[in-house]
């Protein structure tokens, strides 16, 4: 008669649960001891009861030694596993990039009109649409650049016209200043007898009057003439 398999589930009765824990715990500790002795294995066992009481077993001189060994092993294993995962990820990324580059190169060749022998009508239509879209974008960019250049040239033209107007204003100011200076020089120059006017008795007197020498004399009245006569004598 085959014995039925007992379903494992939590024991609801606290007393029964505590009795079962004590029996199973002792059996587990015994099995751990037998495993370490029979197989020369380093075994460590840590058990906490439902009430929080600690039970432990270690085949090594101390449980901490086994725990430290476990930490060192898991650390090295995790690091090695991480490195292997990183290497595999790099390989996968490299392979994916190589496939993308190959596809891009193939697409470039087809756009340039190369390797079209194996293309279907749908593929050729798709290439045609891509080319038309590319040409449209190129024309838009070209128009944008031309508009920018025209705007810069117009701005430069406005600047040059403004500078030219400023220079004309300065030139007009210089001409006006030169005319004023010439007029002032003409009006302040000494008068000379015109060569075309004939010399008559009246004009001769006027000419003599222009040639009269004047002397400044300081002294008593009546002494000026005597002084002049003595000088001429």
UniProtKB/Swiss-Prot annotation:
Transmembrane segments: none annotated. Residues 87-177 form the K-box domain. GO terms for cellular component: nucleus. SMART domains: MADS. Keywords: DNA-binding, Nucleus, Transcription, Transcription regulation. GO terms for biological process: positive regulation of transcription by RNA polymerase II. It is found in: Nucleus. PROSITE patterns: K_BOX (PS51297), MADS_BOX_1 (PS00350), MADS_BOX_2 (PS50066). Residues 1-61 form the MADS-box domain. Signal peptide: none annotated. It comes from the Eukaryota. One of its GO terms (molecular function) is DNA-binding transcription factor activity. InterPro entries: MADS-box/MEF2_TF (IPR050142), MEF2-like_N (IPR033896), TF_Kbox (IPR002487), TF_MADSbox (IPR002100), TF_MADSbox_sf (IPR036879). Pfam families: K-box (PF01486), SRF-TF (PF00319). Probable transcription factor. This is MADS-box transcription factor 56. It comes from Oryza sativa subsp. indica.
């Amino acid at each position: 008669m085959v014995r039925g398999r007992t379903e494992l589930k939590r024991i609801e009765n606290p007393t029964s649960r505590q009795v079962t824990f004590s029996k199973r715990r002792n059996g587990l500790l015994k099995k751990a001891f037998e495993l370490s002795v029979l197989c020369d294995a380093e075994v460590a066992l840590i058990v906490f009861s439902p009430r929080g009481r600690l039970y432990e077993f270690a085949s090594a001189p101390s449980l901490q030694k086994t725990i430290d060994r476990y930490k060192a092993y898991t650390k090295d294993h995790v690091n090695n596993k991480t490195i292997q995962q990183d290497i595999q990820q790099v390989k996968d990324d490299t392979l994916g990039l190589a496939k993308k580059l190959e596809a891009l190169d193939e697409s470039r060749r087809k756009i340039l009109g190369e390797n079209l022998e194996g293309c279907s009508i749908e593929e050729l239509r798709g290439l045609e649409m891509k080319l038309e879209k590319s040409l449209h974008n190129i024309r838009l960019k070209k128009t944008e650049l031309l508009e920018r250049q025209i705007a810069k040239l117009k701005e430069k033209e406005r600047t040059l016209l403004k500078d030219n107007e400023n220079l004309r204003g300065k030139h007009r100011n210089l001409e006006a200043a030169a005319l004023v200076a010439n007029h002032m020089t003409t009006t302040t120059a000494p008068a000379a007898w015109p060569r075309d006017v004939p010399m008559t008795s009246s004009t001769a007197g006027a000419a003599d009057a222009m040639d009269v020498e004047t002397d400044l004399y300081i002294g008593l009245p009546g002494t000026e003439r005597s002084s002049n006569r003595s000088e001429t004598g």
